[in-house]
Amino acid sequence: MLGSDKFSCFSDQHRARSPSPTDRKDKKNHTNKLRELALLIPVTMKTRDKKYTKKEILLRVLHYIQYLQRNIDMTKALLKLHSSNGKGRFVGPGLNPSAGQTQQQHSTPSSSQKPSLWSTSSKPRKKKFTRVSEHPSWPYNPRRSLALDQAENPNTIHPGLKEENEECATYPGVLSPSTYPTTEPSVSEGDGQGAQLVFLDMAQNIFAYDILSDHAVEVQGGEPNADIKVQRSFFLTRAQPCVSSCRQKLFLCTSSEADKEAPDSDPWLPVWTSEDSPNGSPLALGSSQINTWHVADYLNEILGVSSSLFSSPSKILPDHVLEDGTYFLTEGLLESSPATCEVESPQEKEVSSEGPTGPPNFQSSVSLDHCYLSLSENVKVLSNCGSSSESTDTESLWGQEEVRGVATYPRRTGVFSLAQPSVLQQANPEGLQTSSDEDRDYTWTPTGQSSGLPVASKKIKKVQASQGPVKPKDSRKACPGQVKKKCVNGFIMFCRMNRKQYIRACPGTASTAATKDLAQLWRGMTLEEKKPYCTKARRFSRQNNRIVKQENSSSEDDDGETPKPFYQLLAEKAQVSLGLTSLPTPNCQ
C-alpha cells in the first residue's frame, strides 16, 4: 500500500510539472514570434553554428528598443531646443555666472539630481586637443572621458550644477530609464550664430558629478587665456567591452543643420561628429583635428591598440638586435620584395665561395631535409664519383640489350642546398656505392652522416667494404681485390627468361610454384634444347665478370641459336609424346 501511494504521489507531481500540449504550443509560438521580431531589426545578428537562445534574442531586441528610445528622446530635446525663442540661455561650464537671472530661467532646477542634457554656444574657434587627467579628489570613475577642449576656468561653474554635484557626491543616485533628458539653452555673448553642442547622456549608472569631473582648465603661466571667452568641451566615451556601458553620445548641431542626422550611425558604437563631416557622418575628423591629434594616439585611446603597430619595427628595435637586417624588417616586411629564406652556416659559406659565383637563385636556395636528385643531376654525380651495377632484366635478353638510366633516391642525409653541387660532392667524397646485383637502384650512403641510416644499409655497406672499390659499368676487366661471383648456369637463365611469362600466362601463380613447374620442364628437355640457355648464361657471366670455364667457350659463343620459350617446348612435347598426362602443364589457379 505504501509503495502504491508513493507511486501515485510521484505520478501526480510529474503530471503537475510536465507542461500540457497547449503550454508547449504557446511556448513554441512565443519563441517563433521572438525570432521574427529579431529578424525585423536592421542590424542583423552575427551568424554562428550554435543557435541563439531566447535570452540572447530578447536582449538584442531590448538593446535595439533602447537605441530607438534614445534617438526619440534626443529628437524631442533638439526640437524643444530649436523651438525655444532663445532669450533665456543656460550658463555652461566655463562661463561667468553673473550674467543675470534671465540666463537661468530655462535651466534645470538645482533640486534635480540628473542634469542629463545641456548645451553650450560659442564662437567657432579651432583649438588644439589636449588630454587632462582626472581630478584626484574624486572617486574612481568607470566612465572616464577624453576632454578634447578645455574649459577656461574651473571655478566658474553654474551654481545649480555645483549644488547638484555636492548632493550626488553625498547621495549618489541612479538614473532611471524613465528619466527623460531636459534641454538647457546656453548663453551666446556674441552674435548667437555659433554652433551648439548637445551632450546626451543616456547611461543608467552615471552620477551627476561624472560630467563635471571631466572638465579642466588650460592655464598658461598661472593665468587663464584672456582671449578665449567661451570654450567648448568635447567628451568622448572610451570604448568598453560591454556595449551597454557606452551610452554617452556627442552631437554637433548648428542653426543651419538642425534637422540633419547621421544616417549611417552604428547603434552599438560611440558616435561623434565634426563640423567638416558631411551629413554628420560618425568617426569623421577635420583636417585641423587630424593635424593636432595624431591618428596613432586616437587609435590607442579609443581602440586600446598599442602605438607600436603604427610605426616601423626599425624605429622600435635597437640597433644591436637589427644588425644588418633592417631591410628585411622594414621594406622586406612591408613591401613585396624577394628575399632568401636560407640561413647558411659558416661551412656552407666557405663551400659556396669556392664554387662559381652567379646571380642568387631564390627558388632553389631553400634548404631541404629530404633531397631527391633528378636524372640529369644523378648522371653528373655518377660520372664524377663512379659506380657500377649489373643489369638483371631478363626480358631484355630476348631482344637487344639496352642500358637503362638509373635514378637515385638517397636516404635522409641531413641538410644541403640544391643550388650548390659542391656541397653534395663534399658530403660524399668517396662516391656512390652499389647494392646487390638484383637491385638496380643506387643508394647514396655518405660516410660522415651514417648515424641515421637503417640497419639494412649498414649491412650492405659492410659487404661492399669487403669487396673493395667498384669500377664503372662499362669496364670489362675485374677489379683487383674484388671477389668474383658464381657463374650463372643454364637452368637459372631458363628460369629468368620464362618465369615472368609463365606467371603472365597463368595469373595468380606464385613464383615458387612457377619455378617448380619450370624445373620439371627443364628435366624433360634434351641437351640440344638446353644448349642455347647455357650459352646465354655463359655470355652473361663473362660480361658481368663472373667465374666462367674457358674450355670450348669460343665454339659455343659462335653458335647463335636462339633458345626456345617454354610454351614452344610444351607444344613440341605434346605432339611427340603419346602420354600427355605425364608432361608438366601450367598449373593455372
UniProtKB/Swiss-Prot annotation:
<feature type="region of interest" description="Disordered">
    <location>
        <begin position="342"/>
        <end position="363"/>
    </location>
</feature>
<feature type="compositionally biased region" description="Polar residues">
    <location>
        <begin position="544"/>
        <end position="553"/>
    </location>
</feature>
<protein>
    <recommendedName>
        <fullName>Meiosis initiator protein</fullName>
    </recommendedName>
</protein>
<dbReference type="GO" id="GO:0006357">
    <property type="term" value="P:regulation of transcription by RNA polymerase II"/>
</dbReference>
<keyword id="KW-0804">Transcription</keyword>
<keyword id="KW-0539">Nucleus</keyword>
<dbReference type="GO" id="GO:0007283">
    <property type="term" value="P:spermatogenesis"/>
</dbReference>
<dbReference type="GO" id="GO:0005634">
    <property type="term" value="C:nucleus"/>
</dbReference>
<feature type="compositionally biased region" description="Polar residues">
    <location>
        <begin position="176"/>
        <end position="186"/>
    </location>
</feature>
<feature type="region of interest" description="Disordered">
    <location>
        <begin position="422"/>
        <end position="457"/>
    </location>
</feature>
<dbReference type="GO" id="GO:0003677">
    <property type="term" value="F:DNA binding"/>
</dbReference>
<dbReference type="InterPro" id="IPR011598">
    <property type="entry name" value="bHLH_dom"/>
</dbReference>
<keyword id="KW-0805">Transcription regulation</keyword>
<dbReference type="Pfam" id="PF00505">
    <property type="entry name" value="HMG_box"/>
</dbReference>
<feature type="compositionally biased region" description="Polar residues">
    <location>
        <begin position="422"/>
        <end position="435"/>
    </location>
</feature>
<comment type="subunit">
    <text>Interacts with STRA8.</text>
</comment>
<comment type="function">
    <text>Gatekeeper of meiotic initiation in both male and female germ cells. In complex with STRA8, directly activates the transcription of a subset of critical meiotic genes playing a central role in cell-cycle switching from mitosis to meiosis. Temporal expression of MEIOSIN is required for meiotic entry decision.</text>
</comment>
<dbReference type="GO" id="GO:0090427">
    <property type="term" value="P:activation of meiosis"/>
</dbReference>
<feature type="region of interest" description="Basic motif">
    <location>
        <begin position="14"/>
        <end position="27"/>
    </location>
</feature>
<dbReference type="InterPro" id="IPR036638">
    <property type="entry name" value="HLH_DNA-bd_sf"/>
</dbReference>
<dbReference type="InterPro" id="IPR009071">
    <property type="entry name" value="HMG_box_dom"/>
</dbReference>
<feature type="domain" description="bHLH">
    <location>
        <begin position="14"/>
        <end position="68"/>
    </location>
</feature>
<feature type="region of interest" description="Disordered">
    <location>
        <begin position="89"/>
        <end position="191"/>
    </location>
</feature>
<feature type="region of interest" description="Disordered">
    <location>
        <begin position="1"/>
        <end position="31"/>
    </location>
</feature>
<keyword id="KW-0238">DNA-binding</keyword>
<feature type="compositionally biased region" description="Low complexity">
    <location>
        <begin position="101"/>
        <end position="122"/>
    </location>
</feature>
<dbReference type="InterPro" id="IPR036910">
    <property type="entry name" value="HMG_box_dom_sf"/>
</dbReference>
<dbReference type="GO" id="GO:0046983">
    <property type="term" value="F:protein dimerization activity"/>
</dbReference>
<feature type="region of interest" description="Disordered">
    <location>
        <begin position="544"/>
        <end position="566"/>
    </location>
</feature>
<dbReference type="GO" id="GO:0048477">
    <property type="term" value="P:oogenesis"/>
</dbReference>
<feature type="DNA-binding region" description="HMG box">
    <location>
        <begin position="484"/>
        <end position="552"/>
    </location>
</feature>
<keyword id="KW-0469">Meiosis</keyword>
<feature type="region of interest" description="Helix-loop-helix motif">
    <location>
        <begin position="28"/>
        <end position="68"/>
    </location>
</feature>
<dbReference type="GO" id="GO:0071300">
    <property type="term" value="P:cellular response to retinoic acid"/>
</dbReference>
<dbReference type="GO" id="GO:0051321">
    <property type="term" value="P:meiotic cell cycle"/>
</dbReference>
